């Protein structure tokens, strides 16, 4: 072309890294906008789910995500996973793109990722995510109105701070549907909350059938394990008196929980008895005799013959709170439980109108010399 003439039409540029910083920045911002627009157009025109993530060399992350895929970015686990990936050491710079199929211009079909497509996809998008895990036929002491809602939704929420280990990312299930399970009148919600994370609201839902394995690797990151099991039966006048609270906290610095916490472990009512699951044992008490501290511990570890003993302290006055001490010989059980409090308000099955009968359960850890540390 003559000297004064600018190039007309399209110019094919070389597919290689742009060394000029200014030109590279300009190309990035222009093409980022373009690819975001393309992603939006693709999802709108075809009604498909699109997730696009662009990380700039200045450390900024730009995303486009349709509604179903937004939890991949907004949830705490999703954020942590993205952070981990972006902070990982660089692969060999600008290697031949043909080595990685996903880096080819046409993309790559993830054959092991599929999802359910139904006829009316837009009508109920959350219907596959939360299935009822068990059926409540009748609870002692509740009114017969529970028969109208025989299925009980059960959800498990794991929330933690930035230090939450990424290995617990089990399933990218949307967290936006959790309120539907929480607000149901006879819903049972099992929450596991990390200590550093009481304020951070990142929720992750694990479908039933998954097992949350707490190994020794989590000792530093999740210092306190608290498990709350709420069971509020549906009745004509629901009040806080009929809820059963099981709170287990452990203030010690490193907690190793070798037990597996199943999402299906909710209090089960068997013939007037309440079974309270806990990470180390199943606490079992008849509902009628909770006030006198009659509580047996079924040990979860069968390989240790004498793992836990239960000793009762006598209740002298009528206003006293019965205390039960769980003692574990050192070396048999790996769970240092420092305080277990069991508040039983108006035991289900004998809905007393006079108020709440309070049962407090304290588990005290024994050190090597078997001296009970008094709280």
Curated annotation (Swiss-Prot):
Record bears the keyword Transmembrane helix: no
Gene Ontology biological process terms, A to Z: actin cytoskeleton organization; positive regulation of transcription by RNA polymerase II
Location of this chain's protein in the cell: Nucleus
One Pfam family recorded for the sequence: SRF-TF
Chief place of localization: nucleus
Low complexity: compositionally biased ranges: 233-252
Record keywords: Activator, Developmental protein, DNA-binding, Nucleus, Phosphoprotein, Transcription, Transcription regulation
Superkingdom as given in the UniProt entry: Eukaryota
Record text on subunit structure and interactions: Binds DNA as a multimer, probably a dimer.
PANTHER family: SERUM RESPONSE FACTOR HOMOLOG
Physiological role: SRF is a transcription factor that binds to the serum response element (SRE), a short sequence of dyad symmetry located 300 bp to the 5' of the site of transcription initiation of some genes (such as FOS). Together with MRTFA transcription coactivator, controls expression of genes regulating the cytoskeleton during development, morphogenesis and cell migration.
Protein name as annotated: Serum response factor
Source species of the chain: Gallus gallus
């Amino acid at each position: 072309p003559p000297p004064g003439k600018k190039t007309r039409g399209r110019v094919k540029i070389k597919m290689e890294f742009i060394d000029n910083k200014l030109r590279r920045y300009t190309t990035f911002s222009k093409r980022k906008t373009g690819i975001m627009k393309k992603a939006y157009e693709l999802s709108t025109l075809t009604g498909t789910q699109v997730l696009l993530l662009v990380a700039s060399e200045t450390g900024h992350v730009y995303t486009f995500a349709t509604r179903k895929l937004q939890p991949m970015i907004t949830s705490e686990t999703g954020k942590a996973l993205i952070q981990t990936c972006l902070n990982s050491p660089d692969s060999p710079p600008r290697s031949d793109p043909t080595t990685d199929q996903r880096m080819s211009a046409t993309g790559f079909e993830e054959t092991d990722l599929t999802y359910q497509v139904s006829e009316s996809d837009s009508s109920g998008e959350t219907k596959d995510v939360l299935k009822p895990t068990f059926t409540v036929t009748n609870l002692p002491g509740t009114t017969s109105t529970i028969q109208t809602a025989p299925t009980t939704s059960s959800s498990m929420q794991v929330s933690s701070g930035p230090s939450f280990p990424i290995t617990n990312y089990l399933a990218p299930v949307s967290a936006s549907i959790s309120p539907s399970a929480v607000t149901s009148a006879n819903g049972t919600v099992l929450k596991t909350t990390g200590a550093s994370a009481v304020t951070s609201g990142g929720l992750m839902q694990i479908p039933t059938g998954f097992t949350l394995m707490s190994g020794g690797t989590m000792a530093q990151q999740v210092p306190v394990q608290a498990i709350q099991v709420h069971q509020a039966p549906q009745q004509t006048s629901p009040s806080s008196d009929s809820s059963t609270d099981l709170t287990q906290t452990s203030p010690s610095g490193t907690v190793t929980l070798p037990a597996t916490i199943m999402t299906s472990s909710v209090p089960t009512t068997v013939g007037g008895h309440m079974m309270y699951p806990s990470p180390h044992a199943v606490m079992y008490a008849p509902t009628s005799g909770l006030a006198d501290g009659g509580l047996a511990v079924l040990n979860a570890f069968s390989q240790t013959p004498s793992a836990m003993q239960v000793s009762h302290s006598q209740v002298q006055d009528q206003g006293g709170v019965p205390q039960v001490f769980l003692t574990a010989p050192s070396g048999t059980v790996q769970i240092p439980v420092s305080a277990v409090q069991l508040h039983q308000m108006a035991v289900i099955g004998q809905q007393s109108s006079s108020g709440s009968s309070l049962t407090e359960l304290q588990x005290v850890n024994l050190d090597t010399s078997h001296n009970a540390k008094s709280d």
